[in-house]
């Protein structure tokens, strides 16, 4: 009986994916939504690879069948079967869509479940993702700019054609923007971006970013398009921006740390992150300004423990006014591009919606 297969473009349709590669391969990069349920673990894969080099494919297959047999084989088939029963539209893939995914298909079929595999595997799907990013770089892009705290990310998230670059990178793009949880690898970031761009087939709206978001690079072709794309600029008063920054960088950050690590460890980790972030901009602040902000930050931590997170505004306000705002205004002065629209958050959202509605279909 033939085993069904699908074109690699299916990687962009966000179907549940069973990645049967070894954990070490999965860690280097996977596709959004993929779950690693390997045919062989790292040690087994290594042993089979050595046998392949020494004695060829037949000997390697024979060794693999001996290593993954009996109870071990039954456990791995059971894991695939359990996933398939929860996700009947699941798809299997390995590195090249060859032997490992076909073996997994066959074993599952013997257990009464038929799932398709991706033709060409991870390698072909990655080529599709890269092609999608290249295609998106040739489509219309609108960039949302503005001072820190203008809720640019929320504006992008409110649009059907919005691509949340910081969300995919799990980083807010500044010294204070690191997410409490581990961020994706470069490959994982590109895969998530490619999958998102595949839904914005006529154009997209993104937030103004430098090439690097944390430790991740926006793919060059797409970033070059962003650099020359038309812009809109959100302008909001300081008190509004300050409240937004406190919510994003203090309240939400604290809830995430507390929920994942508990009260005591979460508090310690959050305080360490914010203290370290301030130290990273010490040279640009200058010694006197840094020491002043450090003292204000320490006082804010004390008030925070009493339930007063608003106390953080005492150090966030000068950080914005004396560091981030001047830096952004300098960048704005160097830009050769005029904004298509300048206004408050609501007017910029309306403009972006009108822009996306006017895209050629």
UniProtKB/Swiss-Prot annotation:
The keyword S-adenosyl-L-methionine does not apply. GO terms for molecular function: transferase activity, transferring alkyl or aryl (other than methyl) groups; tRNA 2-selenouridine synthase activity. It catalyses: 5-methylaminomethyl-2-thiouridine(34) in tRNA + selenophosphate + (2E)-geranyl diphosphate + H2O + H(+) = 5-methylaminomethyl-2-selenouridine(34) in tRNA + (2E)-thiogeraniol + phosphate + diphosphate; 5-methylaminomethyl-2-thiouridine(34) in tRNA + (2E)-geranyl diphosphate = 5-methylaminomethyl-S-(2E)-geranyl-thiouridine(34) in tRNA + diphosphate; 5-methylaminomethyl-S-(2E)-geranyl-thiouridine(34) in tRNA + selenophosphate + H(+) = 5-methylaminomethyl-2-(Se-phospho)selenouridine(34) in tRNA + (2E)-thiogeraniol; 5-methylaminomethyl-2-(Se-phospho)selenouridine(34) in tRNA + H2O = 5-methylaminomethyl-2-selenouridine(34) in tRNA + phosphate. InterPro entries: Rhodanese-like_dom, Rhodanese-like_dom_sf, SelU. Keywords: Selenium, Transferase. The keyword Transferase applies. It holds the Pfam family Rhodanese. The active site is at residue 94. Its EC number is 2.9.1.3. Residues 11-134 form the Rhodanese domain. One of its GO terms (biological process) is tRNA wobble uridine modification. Monomer. Belongs to the SelU family. Involved in the post-transcriptional modification of the uridine at the wobble position (U34) of tRNA(Lys), tRNA(Glu) and tRNA(Gln). Catalyzes the conversion of 2-thiouridine (S2U-RNA) to 2-selenouridine (Se2U-RNA). Acts in a two-step process involving geranylation of 2-thiouridine (S2U) to S-geranyl-2-thiouridine (geS2U) and subsequent selenation of the latter derivative to 2-selenouridine (Se2U) in the tRNA chain. This is tRNA 2-selenouridine synthase. It comes from Chromohalobacter salexigens (strain ATCC BAA-138 / DSM 3043 / CIP 106854 / NCIMB 13768 / 1H11).
């Amino acid at each position: 009986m033939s085993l069904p297969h699908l074109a690699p473009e299916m990687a962009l349709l966000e179907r549940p994916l069973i990645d049967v590669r070894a954990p070490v391969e999965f860690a280097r990069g996977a596709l959004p939504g993929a779950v690693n349920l390997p045919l062989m673990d790292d040690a087994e894969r290594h042993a089979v690879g050595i046998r392949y080099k020494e004695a060829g494919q037949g000997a390697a297959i024979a060794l693999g069948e001996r290593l993954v047999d009996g109870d071990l084989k039954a456990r791995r088939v059971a894991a695939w079967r359990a996933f398939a029963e929860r996700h009947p539209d699941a798809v299997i893939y390995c590195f090249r869509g060859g032997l490992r995914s076909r073996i997994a298909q066959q074993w599952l079929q013997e257990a009464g479940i038929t799932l398709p595999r991706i033709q060409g595997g991870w390698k072909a799907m990655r080529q599709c993702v890269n092609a999608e990013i290249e295609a998106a770089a040739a489509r219309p892009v609108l960039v949302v700019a503005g001072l820190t705290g203008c809720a640019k990310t929320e504006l992008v998230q409110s649009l059907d054609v919005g691509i949340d670059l910081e969300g995919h990178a799990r980083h807010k793009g500044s010294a204070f923007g690191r997410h409490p949880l581990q961020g994706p690898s470069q490959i994982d970031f590109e895969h998530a971006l490619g999958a998102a761009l595949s839904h914005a087939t006529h154009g997209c709206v993104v937030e103004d970013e430098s090439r690097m978001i944390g430790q991740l690079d926006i793919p060059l072709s797409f970033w070059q398009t962003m650099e020359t794309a038309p812009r809109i600029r959100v302008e909001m008063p300081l008190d509004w921006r300050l409240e937004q920054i406190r919510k994003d960088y203090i309240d939400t950050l604290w809830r995430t740390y507390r929920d994942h690590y508990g009260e005591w460890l979460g508090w310690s980790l959050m305080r360490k992150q914010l203290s370290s972030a301030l130290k990273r901009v010490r040279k640009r602040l200058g010694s006197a300004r840094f020491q002043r902000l450090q003292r204000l930050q320490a006082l804010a931590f004390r008030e925070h423990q009493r339930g007063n997170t608003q106390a953080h505004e005492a150090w966030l306000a000068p950080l914005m006014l004396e560091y981030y705002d001047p830096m952004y205004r300098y960048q704005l002065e160097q830009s050769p591009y005029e904004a298509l629209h300048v206004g408050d958050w609501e007017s910029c959202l309306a403009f972006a919606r009108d822009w996306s509605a006017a895209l050629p279909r």
